[in-house]
Amino acid sequence: MDQPISVTLSSTTDPLWRSCHEYDNEMVITVNGRRIFPTLEYTVTGLDTFKLYSMCMHLDLVDDKKLRFTGGQWAESVSTEKKDPPRKVWHHNGSQTGKDWMLRNVSFDQIRITNRKSKEDGNASYVHLLTQHRYIPVLTIYEGDQLVHTARIPHSQFISVTAYHKGELNTLKTNNNPYSTGSRKDRRRERQSPVYSEGTSSEKSISPPPAKKIKDMAPALPDYSVISKPNLLQSLIFPMIAEQPSTSQSPPAPPVFPFNPDLQMQMLQPFMLPQFGFPCGFPSINPFMNPFLTPFTSMFPTPTVSPDGEGVKLEPEAFVEV
């Protein structure tokens, strides 16, 4: 006799679903779509290993009541809103054998619930829900085109809301949901908090959080004081010059002559002014032989010595009448 088909929530998600059900499980819906948490993950058994099956999920209204949270509890009233047929979301694995379906858990984590009907257009995984209504997930199994099994798990029902009303439920989901904003803040706070480690003694040491790494915008230059090769220093400071090929022989140095003060004075003698002795005030050199005073030699006749040795005789210049 063939084993009947059985559908249960997976062992990893069923305990959390039961815990949320104790607080009248609420599911937040948004305009942009929100994941269902806990995840709709099932374990299916009793399928024919060789037959082909396909599965889909839809969210069905539990009743025609609209809920309102007041006084710390939910109050019911008759819902007058229009109800559309529930939208079916097919599993992304499509059609496969019963062996493949039973090999692993069946998850519908691709479903997003929204409170805007237009979000369903062009988004196969989006499902529109009415706010403050009670829903229950329904898993349907098809063999070809024939419906063979429908599963409704009572403690998986929830109330669609735009914000949590019970703090205990909010804390429970935040601490277990990896996609929750509060859960991310808690994990970030844990990473930034000091880490306590026990050593050999009874005292506990606190290790500070790691400092932020600062990226250097420019590479650090080496210590030039330890560079012994000048060519290497030149290549670091002037890379364009270092690329030019260098010859092995340096150019010859200019000849160096010893310092000669007499030679230097002889070279500067034509440019020197006449030197006057002290205290007479007469020039110590012949002013008539100075090259700078050559224009004045025609104004002063040069004395001549007479042949008879009687002394110096000045010859008057001859004047020519014109």
From Swiss-Prot:
Question: Which keywords belong to this entry?
Answer: DNA-binding, Nucleus, Transcription, Transcription regulation
GO CC entries: chromatin; nucleus
Q: Which GO terms describe its biological process?
A: cell fate specification; positive regulation of DNA-templated transcription; regulation of transcription by RNA polymerase II
Q: Where is this region: Disordered?
A: 171-214
UniProt-listed Gene3D superfamilies = Transcription factor, T-box (2.60.40.820)
Supply one GO molecular-function term: DNA-binding transcription factor activity, RNA polymerase II-specific
Instruction: Name the InterPro entries on file.
Output: p53-like_TF_DNA-bd_sf (IPR008967), T-box_DNA-bd (IPR046360), T-box_sf (IPR036960), TF_T-box (IPR001699), TF_T-box_CS (IPR018186)
Its primary localisation, in coarse terms, equals nucleus
Localization per Swiss-Prot or TrEMBL: Nucleus
The record ties this protein, via Pfam families, to: T-box (PF00907)
Q: Where is the composition biased (Polar residues)?
A: 171-182
List the SUPFAM superfamilies hit by this protein, alphabetically: p53-like transcription factors (SSF49417)
Q: Does the keyword Iron-sulfur apply?
A: no
What positions does the DNA-binding region cover?
Answer: 16-185
Name the UniProt record assigns to this protein: Putative T-box protein 11
